[in-house]
């Protein structure tokens, strides 16, 4: 694994404060100490105690972590574009896992690798689409096994189907 490059986040992105980030997605304060993230309140729910799963730097102007990493190393986002996590893991902010895509493409990618909490306690509903595999460079069987772990299923996924499992 290559040594990450550390760079100062442009002060205008973080309310004039000093913050550093690495290409591995880790953040550091001016003293070189690791900075913890918090989760942003969800704007897409009517339940005020719910949080989205996008980590953000609250003490640094409420900026989303993956936006800070991308904009620090690549530059400002193109107007109307969104930052996507290539592997679907919202906690992986490494620069090689981030890309700029259109909102429509981002929604399409998100629905292929989604895990939704069912209303029935202890049930998960998963949706998988085989055409999402084109974004991964690994054998199909290896990817299916990885996705089975990711979606909390005890067995490989039956592709292009909606299914339920007891967890």
Please report, for each region that a protein language model flagged, where it lies by residue:
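Conserved recognition-core residues within compact binding domains
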Residues: 1-82, 89-164
């Amino acid at each position: 694994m290559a040594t990450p490059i550390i760079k100062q986040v442009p002060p205008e992105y973080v309310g004039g404060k000093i913050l550093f980030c690495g290409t591995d997605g880790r953040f550091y304060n001016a003293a070189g100490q690791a900075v913890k993230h918090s989760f942003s309140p969800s704007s897409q729910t009517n339940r005020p105690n719910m949080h989205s799963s996008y980590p953000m730097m609250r003490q640094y102007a409420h900026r989303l972590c993956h936006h800070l990493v991308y904009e620090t190393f690549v530059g400002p986002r193109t107007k109307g574009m969104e930052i996507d996590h290539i592997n679907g893991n919202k906690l992986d902010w490494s620069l090689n896992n981030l890309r700029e895509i259109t909102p429509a493409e981002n929604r399409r990618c998100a629905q292929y690798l989604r895990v939704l909490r069912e209303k029935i306690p202890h049930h998960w509903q998963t949706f998988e689409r085989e055409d999402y595999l084109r974004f991964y460079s690994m054998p199909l069987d290896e990817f299916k096994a990885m996705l089975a772990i990711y979606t909390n299923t005890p067995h490989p996924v039956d592709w292009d189907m909606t299914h339920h499992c007891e967890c």
